[in-house]
Amino acid sequence: NRVPYKSAPETEAWVSDSIDVAKALGCKNILLAFFSAGDLRNDPAGKKEVIRRLKKVAPKAETADVVLGIESWLSAEEHLEILSAVGSSHVKVYYDLANATKMGYDIFKEIALLGAENICEIHFKENGQLLGQGKVDFERVKVSLDNIGYKGWYIMEGAIPKGMEVLPAYRQNLNFVSQLMKS
């Protein structure tokens, strides 16, 4: 995020190299984060350059069968505009529930709009709260994801209350997610 993909020349090689590394490790998804200096909100020139760069590297991702996942502050509609412009089945959205909620997006409509075919992974996250104790309605999220037929990864992230140690927090988060997935 300090060295933005939208403007730093060296990031083109980094993303290209990350495809080789992911393939060698057997990883299917690469997270491309667009925050801080890399933020694409209100930046048409930045979006245009990201699209240009992704179009250039997408064939390599396709050959390697590795997905480049965009995580950003953008809405589902804006993400779909980028995906459509790039035109590759190997460029998708790495959807972060807490970020989208923080932005005021209707995450249930966004999930339906994106569809399973455009989401590579989901961040289960509550900023500063344990999963299920913050603003995200995970029961509705699960129903929404089931409705679109999402079968990908769920990644627990950033769900630790201030002052709580990581291991106990993630044990509780894992228990919450396990129970949620059984419902």
Predicted region positions:
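Active-site acidic/histidine proton-transfer and metal-coordination neighborhood
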Residues: 1-93
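Histidine-acidic metal/acid-base catalytic patches
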Residues: 26, 76-183
